[in-house]
Amino acid sequence: MFYSCCVSIEPRDPASEPTPTPRRPLRKSQPRSFSQAQPLSWAQLESVLSGRGAGLRNLRAVGVGEGQRRTTSLDPAEAEGTGAEGASQKGITTPFAELHASSAYNFLRGASQPEQMVEAARELGLSALACVDRDGFYGAARFATAVAESGADLATVFGAELSLDVPLTVLCKGREGYTRLSRVIADARMADPDKDSVRYPSLPQLAEAAGGHWLVLLDWRRTDAQLVDFFGADNVVVELQHTMNPADADRNERLHALAVRHGLREIVSSAPTCATPKHSRLAGAKAALRERKDMAAAEPTTHPVGGSWLRSGEEMLQLAGDCEWLARAVETSVQVAEECAFTLDLVAPNLPHFPVPEGYTEMTWLRAITERGGAQRYGPRGSSAAANQAWATIDRELETIEQLGFPGYFLIVHDIVSFCHENNIFCQGRGSAANSAVCFALGITTVDAVASGLLFERFLSPERDGPPDIDLDIESGRREEAIQYVYSRYGRENAAQVANVITYRRRGATRDAGRALGYAPGQIDAWTRHPEQTPDVVQNLAEQMLDHPRHLGIHSGGMVICDRPIAQVVPTEWARMEGRSVVQWDKDDCAAVGLVKFDLLGLGMLEALHHAVDQVRAHRGREVELWRLDPTESEVYAMLSRADAVGVFQVESRAQMSTLPRLKPRTFYDLVVEVALIRPGPIQGGSVHPYIRRRNGLEPVTFDHPCLEPALTKTLGIPLFQEQLMQMAVDAAGFSGAEADTLRRAMGSKRSPQKMERLKKRFYQGLEAKNGIRGVVADRLWDKIVAFASYGFPESHSQSFASLVYYSAWFKYHYPAEFCVALLRAQPMGFYSPQSLLADARRHGVEVLPVDVNDSDVQVDAVASLATPPRTNRPTGVHGLGRGTGEPVGQIRLGLSGAGGVKGISAEVAERIVEARERIGRFTSVEDLSREAGLTVAHVEKLARAGALGSLGLTRRQAVWAAGVAATERPGMLPGTSGVHAPALPGMSAFEMVASELATTGVTTAEHPVQLLREYLDEWHLRPAPRGVHPGDAAPRGGAAVVTADSLLRVPDGTRVRVAGVVTHRQRPATAGGVVFFGLEDETGLANIVVSQGLWARQRAVALNAKILVVRGIVHNAEGAATVTADLLEQVETQLRPAGEIAGAHAGSRDFR
């Protein structure tokens, strides 16, 4: 191997070495004989190349060869006291600036997070650091934040590497250089709609764009001084490199000669792609992935040891040895850094000035429209005591808004909301904005903050750093209209969406680690399914990748707007979705630099509610205004208390439906609590069960300390909301409002564990100083706060969501047919599939009519019944909800397309069918349909198999036969001139009909699949068990019979039962300790199944793959909600042929969402 001649150990007597001095004097280069150097042993070489071993940092120059070429050696005598840890021990005095580093935000190039790079630079005593990314400033804000938070005396230099024919590294000279480079990168990325394309102008044009405000680095990849001709000698710096690459010496010699010839300054860099040697192997893995190779295949073009790392000034001088020009380059690096360094907050923008009517300022206009809206919401000033209280709150809020200079922010949000209202788009503000009476008066939120007693300070306070945060929920189907309105209103250059940095998670990291190490794709897939089988070498590499950025995504709805082109602050690029541009920073980075974010979030339930309002208007003749609904209807709360909540916003999950019968909500505030209760924060904080016990009078209301009573009284001494945790910090630990807000932000931040650790010491000190709280009580209080780092809700957020809970429950109770149609039209959304939603509607007395070319619309629709008042008697029961009796309370007709429609029939084809029917009247034959609607054979066959041709007098099999006629029928042909009449064909069995419906539409209209299997299931315990299921093999199973889901609540608690159904979902919550929860559905309703870790391991194949299950287990129903803790799972479709037909056509469950 060639490494052994380039990397060596120089034999010497450590005792004879002089004591290291802080700075070595420059001496003339004197070559030493390489014969005096001793080659590395194989063990040492392997240690270097693999990234292991204490001596990895301690490679130093041993001599200057011909032409002053440098080689390196491993110096055991200096093994101690070097590196990031030892550097500080030796008292570094050699200034050095690393100006060409790459963090992990240089995607698939850097191997250390910006925080790690900054920490290493601080320990090494660097004067300045530049973290450059390829074609962007992806990590610039996080780098700047890391430096600010570290407290290090480290200057920040910003730059980027541009993807020209030969890559060009550019450093910005201060703020002006940064804005010019950001603009150039944005133009290059936006020049082509292809997101992955970058089109830079020519070098002369780049030099013109720089205007003398860039320094360009001339490194080994360029062999001429062309850059000098375009940028000028003062703006070109030669970059020499010490990277442990054997080619460094020759490259540096050529570059030095070029610098001398043209009078250019020289700097030196280790071109680090990681912070410390231990990350170099990861750098090599990422480099291989970048080239779409494994590490072995990429070896010829990647770094010999994976990557280089940060080095101190002393180390760089050691590497320079006796070479004067290399040593001078260390010093010059600091001078160049001083020329370029600046802090990123200098580019912070402002919001655009909002256009207001003549004679108004932004503040006076905000007061005017608030006055108008407040009169509508609360009544005129002085009209009542309640109105006076509201106006006093509004005036106080407006004073704070004026004091902080945020009127423009509120005007922009109001403008977006007004656009939605004017265009009949449902929207509402949520989150902390619901704490504001001004937001309520402006129509931004639907929660009355005054009546609800919400604190404005949670939303906005004088101590707050930065603007408030208003999230707008917009009906998902029309959110794009609002986004495009923002682009058109404020300009494409001044508005963009916020990025979401996609980071490595366990499965993705395992995949990429396996690829980098050269394993076969099939083997890697197996490891992602069975993580416990992953080899240590893959696991170790994958562990290093976790949480590293992989690529750029797009935030679900965050937009930034500013008073100048955003590209002057951060480059923009095209998003994957057409018509959207995105900045290169996530929401935290945008906030850190002062870009104000507006969240325009798509919410499926708002779309569903809009459809529900439209359906009731069209088919019942009633205009429903959501905000006028009476929130006290006892029947609606009684329905929810029975866990009759399929399709109801936020409370339809397994956990929520198990909680509803125990909580028994009776008031709107109970819904507020219900929304907040089943969240990771309250669950991890141990709040759920104590609250319910106290709510039901089974446990006394107590407080950990009397000082907590003001904050926790309304939730019975149990913390549920973020506002309460803030108040606890103020009352118990003496936090200021600003400190409490900092704590609250740490709760919701992605980086909250680190931030909250820094607050812990302050919290404990405050507890003892103010209230004498210490020990177990102090720990308990801190644990409750830490639990909310897993995203507990703010109360204002729960208030907003509770409104949607009530609205959706109201529609479900009064108009079940229209509500089901609304949910189907808003798909995909929610917890349940269209099949489950329709099955639930049938259990509530709704008749589901099949798809038909003569009766169906493009989408599913309720059947008009203007004379029929809504039914107020609902089926009873829990889970199963009972079977509806009597006349149907409504009818649903499946559509030709969309949810419940015919698979393979697009909306465009469905519109052609409806248009043809409206033009000529009802279709009378397949030929008629095909000709007038211009359908293909494939279209007609799909309609035939779905039973959509039933009104033509054809069975499904006859219709499929007749579909071939469509091949010759086209518009303009004489009717009846083609085709052959279908012969007599046998009908389909009930099982075949259900399987056909599931295969073609994904839903059944009449019978639930399990209903057809009931006669088999009733005898399940009498049937022989297949081999391997029971010890008796072919002996009867024995034991409990199969019961229906709706009977589980009536079975004595602790009884062993069997229950059967179609698997609707599988869940493994992070807070459940590995337990998996199943949903089973039969013709009577839903059953909750608990599968332990052990049972999952024993029956993994059945548990993971079965579509229809018989579950044996113990019923737990003592608290009003029934669950079955499974001890045996049996896959029905493998044991009953009819079940196999159904399972083969079933779309499957919604797993692990």
Curated annotation (Swiss-Prot):
The lineage of its organism: Bacteria, Bacillati, Actinomycetota, Actinomycetes, Mycobacteriales. Its EC number is 2.7.7.7. It catalyses: DNA(n) + a 2'-deoxyribonucleoside 5'-triphosphate = DNA(n+1) + diphosphate. GO terms for biological process: DNA repair; DNA replication. The keyword Transferase applies. PANTHER family: DNA POLYMERASE III SUBUNIT ALPHA, ERROR-PRONE DNA POLYMERASE. Pfam families: DNA_pol3_alpha, DNA_pol3_finger, HHH_6, PHP. The gene is dnaE2. Residues 1-39, 64-89 are annotated as: Disordered. Belongs to the DNA polymerase type-C family. DnaE2 subfamily. This is Error-prone DNA polymerase. It is an enzyme of class 2 (transferase). GO terms for cellular component: cytoplasm. SUPFAM superfamilies: RuvA domain 2-like (SSF47781). It comes from the Bacteria. DNA polymerase involved in damage-induced mutagenesis and translesion synthesis (TLS). It is not the major replicative DNA polymerase. Gene3D superfamilies: 1.10.150.870, Metal-dependent hydrolases. Keywords: Cytoplasm, DNA damage, DNA repair, DNA replication, DNA-directed DNA polymerase, Nucleotidyltransferase, Transferase. GO terms for molecular function: 3'-5' exonuclease activity; DNA-directed DNA polymerase activity. It is found in: Cytoplasm.
